[in-house]
């Protein structure tokens, strides 16, 4: 059983994702995905966590995420207006955007595990070239 705030946040996540995909034309936003929403108990404030897929490329500018968040924050009033039209809420929450680095952190952890496994296999194949003597 879900509470009302959980249901509203799930629906908001879907709607904001659609709005970002269809309505926001700012090039700084690029390929943004909504990874989660924290909604206050009174539904007046929403913290929207976003991930930018163009940050995942190797040649990405380190400020890409910062610029994307700034662009979303600048457009938050427009996004809030569109959200109010899409959802039937008495009070449309005030939106703040935050960068969610869990996807990048997860990929980094996965690479670390892959490298450890690869090194372990190499040690089993070549036991004489090990540092431990």
From Swiss-Prot:
Oligomer status and interactors: Monomer. Binds 30S ribosomal subunits, but not 50S ribosomal subunits or 70S ribosomes.
Sorted UniProt keywords: Cytoplasm, Ribosome biogenesis
Purpose: One of several proteins that assist in the late maturation steps of the functional core of the 30S ribosomal subunit. Associates with free 30S ribosomal subunits (but not with 30S subunits that are part of 70S ribosomes or polysomes). Required for efficient processing of 16S rRNA. May interact with the 5'-terminal helix region of 16S rRNA.
Keyword Cytoplasm carried by entry: yes
GO MF annotation list: ribosomal small subunit binding
Similarity comment: family membership: Belongs to the RbfA family.
InterPro entries: KH_dom-like_a/b, RbfA, RbfA_dom_sf, Ribosome-bd_factorA_CS
Main location: cytoplasm
Compartments (UniProt record): Cytoplasm
Protein name: Ribosome-binding factor A
Coiled-coil segments: none
Pfam families tied to this protein: RBFA (PF02033)
Keyword Cytoplasm found: yes
Gene encoding the protein: rbfA
PANTHER family: RIBOSOME-BINDING FACTOR A, CHLOROPLASTIC-RELATED (PTHR33515:SF1)
GO BP, one annotated term: rRNA processing
Any one Gene Ontology cellular component term annotated for this protein: cytosol
Superkingdom assignment: Bacteria
């Amino acid at each position: 059983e879900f509470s009302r705030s959980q249901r509203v946040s799930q629906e908001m996540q879907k709607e904001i994702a659609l709005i970002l995909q269809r309505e926001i034309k700012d090039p700084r936003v690029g390929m943004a995905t909504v990874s989660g929403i924290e909604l206050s108990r009174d539904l007046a404030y929403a913290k929207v966590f976003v991930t930018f897929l163009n940050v995942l490329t190797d040649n990405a500018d380190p400020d890409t995420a910062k610029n994307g968040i700034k662009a979303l924050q600048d457009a938050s009033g427009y996004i809030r207006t569109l959200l109010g039209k899409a959802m039937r809420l008495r009070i449309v929450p005030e939106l703040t955007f935050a960068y969610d680095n869990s996807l990048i952190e997860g990929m980094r952890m996965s690479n670390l595990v892959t490298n450890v496994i690869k090194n372990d296999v190499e040690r089993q194949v070549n036991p004489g070239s090990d540092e431990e003597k």
